[in-house]
């Protein structure tokens, strides 16, 4: 009788342990409504210079205070080329880009410098001296300093809008011509 009681108690204890330790089993990760990233519109409000050979959207993680800040490690997004001569261009980090090389979710975090840049070189160059900033993202209309783009976890941020006025370009980061 005692043996039967101990076996029953042991069986009950084992069932309780399994019941308590099992939550939902192997559960899939929640499906994101939209992959994290950013989008916006660029408005070109003046005539395109003939010297422009290509135009891009760039995103830097850290501010560009010195020429040494302009590095490939700091450059987190380099769009494909914007068609020359357009008056408006819609963009998204989910579109194909040179950096990152494969489209997909863009990492959450703060990004200190989002801009439209032009080059006059025949070939794509990653040298700072070959880039001319023609438009900068400003947060909340504050045009005194570049705006920080903040992408919260699992969030797609819209309205990262930039106005490009070739007649009145923004201050250039250090290291340019």
For each feature predicted by the language model, list its residue ranges.
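A short, solvent-exposed beta-strand micro-motif common in secreted/extracellular proteins
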Residues: 102-126
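Hydrophobic helical h-region of N-terminal Sec-dependent signal peptides
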Residues: 10-15
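Short, ordered, surface-exposed loop/turn motifs in non-cytosolic proteins
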Residues: 47-77
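Tryptophan-paired
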Residues: 65-109
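Surface-exposed coil/turn segments at beta-strand junctions on protein surfaces, enriched
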Residues: 33, 84, 106-108, 152-155
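Structured interaction patches on ligand/partner-binding surfaces of diverse proteins
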Residues: 120-168
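Bacterial Sec-dependent N-terminal signal peptides
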Residues: 2-5, 16-45, 166, 170-177
């Amino acid at each position: 009788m005692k043996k039967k009681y101990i076996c029953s108690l042991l069986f009950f204890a084992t069932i309780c342990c399994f019941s308590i330790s099992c939550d939902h089993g192997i559960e899939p990760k929640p499906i994101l409504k939209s992959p994290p990233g950013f989008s916006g519109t660029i408005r070109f409000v003046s005539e395109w210079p003939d010297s422009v050979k290509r135009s891009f959207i760039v995103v830097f993680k850290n501010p560009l205070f010195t020429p040494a800040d302009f590095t490939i490690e700091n450059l987190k997004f380099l769009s494909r080329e914007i068609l020359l001569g357009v008056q408006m261009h819609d963009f998204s980090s989910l579109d194909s880009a040179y950096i990152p090389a494969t489209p997909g979710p863009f990492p959450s975090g703060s990004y200190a410098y989002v801009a439209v840049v032009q080059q006059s070189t025949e070939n794509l160059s990653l040298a700072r001296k070959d880039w001319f900033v023609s438009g900068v993202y400003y947060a909340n209309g504050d045009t005194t300093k570049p705006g920080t783009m903040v992408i919260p976890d699992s969030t797609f941020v819209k309205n990262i809008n930039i106005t490009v006025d070739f007649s009145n370009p923004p201050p250039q980061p250090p290291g340019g011509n």
